[in-house]
Amino acid sequence: MIYFHNPRCRKSREGLTFLNQKNVHPEVREYLKDALALHELRTILDKLQMRPEELMRKNEAIFKSEIKGKKLTDDELIIKMIEYPKLIERRILVHGDKAVIGRPAENFMSILD
């Protein structure tokens, strides 16, 4: 089980606290320091059953300057997320063949039961 974490993000810290309070202690990966490989991000997207655009933080300045209004393919969007990991939505928990975005944190329980 892996929790993709940004320790500078309050919501990400809250998500990790939520898991720990439920006695769930995943491996923590600080994805801004330990960048995802292309195949890892594709696997996460498959497990989330999401398209790349759905996993992007659209309020980030980099989204507005590099992506908004452009017709990019899914592969191009994935490459942008690898290049600019701040674009990746926070609070992702991967467990086995499933993944979930913890917004709200209670969503984590859907793959832990």
Label each PLM-derived region with a short phrase.
Residues 1-18, 26-31:
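Local sequence-structure signature of Cys/Sec-based thiol-disulfide redox active-site neighborhoods
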